[in-house]
């Protein structure tokens, strides 16, 4: 393996590690602050941290996702890991936007059908947590805008961009596949 590829893969690993560490730290800080604000003592907080119920209410989850997304976005943009420019928007890509909306809407029915066929059930704790979060009006902006924006900056802006520099144009599909696998792995 040449030095350029090794350096690029290390950089991708750093991006991934930073993104995960931000999530872990923000989860702990937001969870502990929330439990302290609710009047829990230290031993109850430790119990909640170990049993996974630290981020169980909708407001706390919403705050966690918002802070996590904002911190990750700011860090990756400010460090230059995910360069942002207006050149694409200045090209007025209205046809692309139109087709994205049409294709997104067009996938709803097939995905609903596939969901019914597979009968995949979400874990009860996850279902309760997201149901509680979606009762918060701001959660739609957090889950629909902030979180996807942060993930795009990390996985496409930093990770995929770096991987694409390591592959010949003919093999860009390898970089895209690696980025997709990393994205899926982070999402469990």
State where each predicted segment sits.
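Small-polar-interrupted transmembrane alpha-helices in polytopic inner-membrane proteins
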Residues: 161, 172-188
